[in-house]
């Protein structure tokens, strides 16, 4: 099991009730996606970012030729019957992240969601197919995924200097959008289509707690123990 998906992490609970081969594939693909997109989100020197992206480009080439080094890609390789498909999607992701290096995320929520969709859609769609099956409502699952990624970015930016951190009203707006979408999805998602739903549920609760504590103390955020979250919906979605 990858370190990013051990007990206590969001990926652990999001994938908990899937069959092993699906669970490990979901976690591996999401870990790789997060690692690549984080290069653009972290405020690092452009030349360093380009070196990291070049490494990932070569790593995807190695994945396609059955010689990956990254733990996530090695785990994914065990179950991936279509390495060329994943390879194309990961190369596209690296290219899109490359175009974003040095650009500040838009402060307009709608534009930011469009940027997230443009960068992540192929990988998110692949994850949706793995987690929800061919008959799942992929558009609904993808909507959750895009909003959840925005929440991820906002929460990550809270560690930046106060002048660069998102305003409280932005956190509140994203949390309300995420909560509203989750409320709709909880009534329409089919049994077992809960990977992105669970990730978003966790972030929704973390955002709620964060906004309550944000003004009082920006530097000390109380994060929800996520082990308490999945118990409440486990029976409802998985029996």
Regions found by a protein language model. Name each.
Residues 104-114, 128-137, 186-187, 191:
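Short helix-to-loop capping/linker segments positioned immediately adjacent to catalytic or ligand/cofactor-binding
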Residues 1-77, 93, 116-122, 138-147, ...:
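Catalytic cores of Mg2+-dependent Asp-rich isoprenoid enzymes
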Residues 73-123:
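Hydrophobic alpha-helical segments and helix pairs
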């Amino acid at each position: 099991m990858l370190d990013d998906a051990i007990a206590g992490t969001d990926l652990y609970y999001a994938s908990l009730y899937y069959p092993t081969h699906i669970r490990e594939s979901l976690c591996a693909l999401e870990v790789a996606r997060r690692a690549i997109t984080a290069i653009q989100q972290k405020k690092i020197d452009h030349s360093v970012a380009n070196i990291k992206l070049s490494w990932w480009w070569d790593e995807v080439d190695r994945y396609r030729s059955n010689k990956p080094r990254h733990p996530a890609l090695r785990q994914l390789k065990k179950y991936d019957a279509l390495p060329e498909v994943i390879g194309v999607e990961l190369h596209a992701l690296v290219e899109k992240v490359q175009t974003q290096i040095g650009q500040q995320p838009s402060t307009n929520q709608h534009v930011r969601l469009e940027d997230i969709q443009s960068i992540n859609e192929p990988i998110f769609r692949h994850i949706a197919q793995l987690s929800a099956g061919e008959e799942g409502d992929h558009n609904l699952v993808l909507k959750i995924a895009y909003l959840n990624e925005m929440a991820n970015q906002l929460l990550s930016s809270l560690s930046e200097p106060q002048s660069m951190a998102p305003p409280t009203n932005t956190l509140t707006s994203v949390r309300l959008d995420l909560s509203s979408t989750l409320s709709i999805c909880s009534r329409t998602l089919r049994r077992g289509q809960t990977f992105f739903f669970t990730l978003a549920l966790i972030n929704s609760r973390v955002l709620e707690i964060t906004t309550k504590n944000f003004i009082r103390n920006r530097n000390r955020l109380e994060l929800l123990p996520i082990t308490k979250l999945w118990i409440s919906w486990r029976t409802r979605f998985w029996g």
